[in-house]
């Protein structure tokens, strides 16, 4: 199975980078196959890249890391570039699914802030397999007209007042993070007792949840279809532009 170049929540499309994928067929057939999160790249960027390089981009999208990983692991599709999150990069490195990046072929690597390269060492210790593109976090988005008071804690997502008006992320990692932070545990905990407690809290919450969603949280909150939900900070900014009643908060217990 061909290894792929991994980019932390990002897409770096340069002719030099593609040439660096020496064990794939990109240079011979003039195309690169990319697997990225939905709506993370403006289609015009891809068009511009194709016009400037003459390289055809085959672009595929996924909603969660957990959907992406088994597809890459099985080798069902021969991707050249993928865009997983931090923790998934660690797993893919461990399972020998990624190819090392030839950084000598990235002419603009020095444009990436050193603090982000340093942060990346938490999951890619030698910065050999990934290039950071953007940083964000997870918090609570709420509609000021649909809540009695502004949420301040993750536990507010268990408030029965918001029954059928709560949106949770349809992602194991993000859902468990909410429960782990609420209970005072590390989101990277592997303690079986702690994880069991988190599972039980999420089961307890289930009757209150309107839906488990990914991208749909954005549209539902903009359309006043829910009062409160878990969302990525980047998407929160977009929703606030579209609906002035929406506010974003990082709970007191912290986040990812």
Where are these regions (language model features)?
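Short, flexible turn/loop "capping" segments at secondary-structure junctions
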Residues: 26, 132-134, 252-256
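A ligand-binding cleft/hinge motif common to bilobed small-molecule-binding domains
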Residues: 88-91, 227-245
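Short, catalytically relevant binding-site loops at active-site mouths
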Residues: 174, 217-219, 228, 234-238, ...
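Periplasmic-binding protein-like
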Residues: 195-204, 242-256
């Amino acid at each position: 199975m061909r290894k792929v170049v991994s980019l932390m929540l990002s897409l770096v499309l340069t002719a030099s980078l593609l040439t660096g994928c020496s064990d794939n067929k990109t240079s011979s057939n003039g195309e690169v196959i990319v697997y990225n999160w939905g709506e993370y790249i403006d289609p015009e960027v891809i068009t511009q890249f194709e016009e400037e390089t003459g390289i055809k981009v085959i672009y595929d999208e996924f909603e969660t890391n957990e959907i992406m990983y088994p597809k890459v692991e099985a080798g069902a599709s021969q991707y050249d570039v993928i865009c997983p999150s931090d923790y998934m990069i660690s797993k893919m490195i461990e399972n020998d699914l990624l190819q090392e990046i030839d950084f000598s072929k990235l002419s603009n690597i020095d444009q990436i802030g050193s603090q982000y390269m340093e942060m990346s060492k938490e999951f890619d210790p030698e910065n050999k397999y990934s290039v950071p593109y953007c940083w964000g976090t997870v918090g609570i988005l709420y509609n000021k007209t649909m809540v009695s008071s502004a949420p301040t804690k993750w536990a507010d997502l268990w408030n029965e007042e918001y029954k059928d008006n709560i949106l949770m992320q349809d992602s194991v990692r993000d859902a468990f993070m909410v429960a782990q932070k609420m209970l005072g545990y590390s989101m990277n905990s592997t303690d079986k007792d702690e994880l069991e407690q988190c599972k039980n809290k999420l089961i307890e919450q289930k009757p209150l949840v309107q839906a488990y969603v990914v991208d749909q949280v954005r549209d539902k909150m903009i359309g006043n279809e829910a009062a409160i939900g878990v969302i990525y900070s980047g998407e929160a900014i977009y929703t606030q532009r579209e609906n002035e009643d929406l506010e974003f908060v990082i709970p007191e217990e912290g986040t990812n």
